[in-house]
Amino acid sequence: MRAFRQKEFGGKVASDLLLSGAGSSMYILYYSLFSDRLNEASPAMILSGFAIVLIGLFFLLSELGRPRNFWRMAKNWRRSWMARGVIFNSLYLLDGLGIALAYALGYEGMIEILGALGLAFAALVLIYPVMLLRDAEDIELWRRAGSSIVILLSALSTGATIISAFSLFMQPSILKISIEISIALILATLLASSLYSSSLGRAEELEREAKKTFNSILLPYTISLALYALAIFSSQPSLQGGIALIASFIAIYGSLEFRLNLLGSGLHPPIVREDLFKK
């Protein structure tokens, strides 16, 4: 198996994978906080999770070149995780449109129904980048599971950091708990990445690349974790929010770099542009 080195599937695809995971994670985490009291939830925060995924989808569409390629690729859902991702994102965004209309019309019952349905679609959107990025044919099953856990946790932690950043402007009342959730998920990501990296050997070139890739997330996440810890002990809400905002940007940068490294590390079979559109 040769490493995945195609430059055309670099920044745009990595951005889509990052935003898909972050937007769906943000929705799942935020909705879970207010699942029993939706009347206290911020519509802007709920809809932000859909907006982030929509931006990611624009990155993917710009990569595909022409709009009709979107539908051509979607037909290939049986054999392509990227094609499945297009379908999952579309269902999730349609649900988000329904929630936006329900908020505009004041249909509280419909908001609850579509909100719960959105959790299912968000879970599918969250799984899509994990499954695409971890798809390695020549790494043992338990190691594939380990890489999936790291990718999943990094997506969840990115979603949590975005909530902490947005809460500063949209819902300051949840700033502290969003920082605490971010700290917990970043710690879990660092632990999982360290354990997975230490399980890899140095003899095989693929394992050396994998080790380097999974270690790349350690520095930015550690800096972000330190800043969040500093924010927790700050007594001034404005300073706490400012530190959390900086920590969020650093964590997002680390997540994007991690995905760029995954796309170039050879951890999964190469994506061939023509394969995306085969019927």
Report residues per predicted region:
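Juxtamembrane membrane-interface segments at transmembrane alpha-helix termini
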Residues: 58-61, 83-85, 131, 257-265
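Helix-boundary and loop/linker segments of multi-pass membrane transporters
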Residues: 5-6, 45, 74, 237-241
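Short, 15-30-residue, compositionally biased linear elements
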Residues: 43-50, 240, 245-248
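Extramembrane terminal tails and long inter-domain/linker segments of multi-pass membrane proteins
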Residues: 1-15, 72-76, 80, 208-212, ...
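Long, contiguous internal "core" modules enriched in hydrophobic/ aromatic residues
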Residues: 11, 17-22, 37, 76-82, ...
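N-terminal signal-anchor module of multipass membrane proteins
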Residues: 1-36, 47-50, 265-268
